[in-house]
């Protein structure tokens, strides 16, 4: 078995990712798409240069589907899916240690995670025939027959609860939770996993989540690697074979949209710390927003471009009020938050906050300068190949296309879309999406500056 590990390591399996190739990243990336008889949607990029395969299986089972009293159910389900496989079809059960050893012996990996919108399962394996067959077979068992052992969940629940209690002592966690609740209100995007909510989650709830959501007909499967279409089709069918076949795939219940803010909100949280945490923002936009590229470029200029951004230039370099400040959007199936965040000395919090608000309001009203626009587009376009320079990164992009229903040639036209953005496009998009007069503000640890003597 050590030989298998050596082969895997030599092929870069334990590295950051298999290199797809810079020249390939700059060229057209053909994405093949088809639907299996089960209803599974399959997206494939053939990358034959390295004998490796990366697969992502996505299901509409993220935390937006969690009941309010069971916040954390999606995360718990994804965690426990990797901690045991049930005995079935004459094959013995595997506990977490046996499962981990089996993957180590194959020099491969398989795991699950949950985000706000989706639950994802990822397989990485070499494509040497024997290794590939064994990896797919084991992944199929883990995906289709998780055991959700009660004793393991009790242990993990205690571990997670302790970690949450410790996190609740950190200023960043406290400020972030207050900000999220103020921005999202009662929307599931704003639910907080707490020790109390974990106590309401049992293995029966995880099994029910699996039964209702993790079905072949709900799967969006993305593959990047050294397999052709026929091989990919067979592999996907094998991966999904142990899930319920022919199950009803009635539309899932709709999740309400994030409610827009109707008035400004400000929360001051006392906290004894060397640095005050300042967060400003509101609900932003959905991933399918037609102004996605204008908002992408605009945020790069405002605060997403690091030291070249307007916020960094004015708040840090000109005024010295912080070591770092930035802005971001987090679009999903619903409007994710627009967030501006910084840390500063407590006696400078009000000055930093006032300047940040002024910069955001000015940007929303007037948009960027032509010089800022050119610099941002050059930076984004110049860095585009780095978004695709490994199989893992390419898989991220293909899965994004699959999940959001984007055009199959999305990556081929990405730089063109960025280049086509005008300053007026940015101004109009920001004016439509953001309302500076109705934003949430959270200041943790700040205090007014002492009066001059």
Language-model features: locations:
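Short, solvent-exposed loop/turn elements at domain surfaces
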Residues: 43-44, 51-54, 64-67, 288-289, ...
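Bacterial N-terminal signal peptides
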Residues: 10-24
């Amino acid at each position: 078995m050590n030989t298998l590990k050596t082969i895997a390591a030599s092929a870069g399996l334990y590295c950051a990712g298999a290199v797809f190739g810079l020249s390939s990243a700059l060229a057209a990336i053909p994405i093949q798409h088809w639907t299996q008889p089960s209803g599974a949607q399959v997206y494939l990029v053939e990358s034959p240069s390295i004998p490796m395969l990366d697969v992502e299986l996505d299901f509409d089972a993220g935390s937006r589907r969690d009941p309010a009293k069971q916040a954390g159910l999606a995360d718990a389900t994804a965690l426990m899916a990797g901690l045991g496989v049930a005995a079935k079809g004459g094959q013995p059960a595997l506990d977490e240690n046996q499962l981990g050893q089996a993957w180590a012996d194959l020099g491969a990996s398989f795991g699950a995670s949950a985000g706000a919108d989706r639950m994802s399962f990822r397989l990485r394996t070499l494509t040497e025939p024997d290794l590939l067959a064994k990896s797919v077979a084991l992944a199929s068992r883990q995906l289709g027959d998780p055991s959700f052992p009660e004793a393991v969940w009790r242990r993990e629940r205690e571990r997670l609860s302790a970690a949450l209690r410790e996190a609740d002592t950190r200023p960043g966690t406290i400020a972030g939770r207050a900000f999220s609740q103020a921005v999202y209100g009662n929307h599931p995007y704003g639910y907080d996993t707490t020790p109390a909510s974990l106590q309401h989650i049992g293995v029966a709830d995880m099994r029910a989540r699996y039964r209702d959501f993790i079905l072949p007909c709900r799967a969006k499967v993305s593959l990047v690697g050294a397999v052709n279409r026929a091989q990919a089709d067979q592999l996907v069918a094998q991966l999904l074979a142990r899930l319920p076949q022919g199950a009803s795939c009635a539309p899932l219940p709709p999740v309400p949209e994030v409610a827009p803010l109707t008035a400004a909100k400000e929360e001051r949280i006392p906290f004894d710390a060397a640095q005050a945490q300042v967060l400003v923002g509101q609900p932003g936009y959905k991933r399918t927003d037609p102004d996605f590229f204008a908002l992408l470029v605009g945020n790069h200029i405002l605060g997403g471009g690091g030291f070249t951004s307007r916020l960094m230039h004015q708040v840090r370099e000109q005024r010295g009020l912080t070591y770092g400040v930035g802005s971001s959007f987090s679009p999903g199936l619903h409007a994710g938050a627009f967030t501006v965040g910084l840390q500063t000395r407590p006696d400078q919090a009000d000055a930093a906050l006032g300047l940040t608000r002024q910069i955001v309001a000015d940007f929303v009203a007037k948009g960027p300068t032509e010089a800022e626009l050119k610099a941002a587009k050059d930076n984004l376009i110049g860095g585009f190949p780095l978004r695709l320079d490994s199989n893992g990164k390419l898989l991220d992009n293909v899965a994004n296309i699959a999940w959001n229903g984007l055009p199959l040639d999305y990556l081929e036209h990405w730089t063109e879309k960025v280049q086509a953005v005008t300053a007026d496009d940015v101004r109009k998009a920001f004016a439509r999406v953001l309302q500076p007069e109705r934003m949430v503000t959270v200041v943790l640890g700040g205090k007014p500056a002492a009066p001059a003597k």
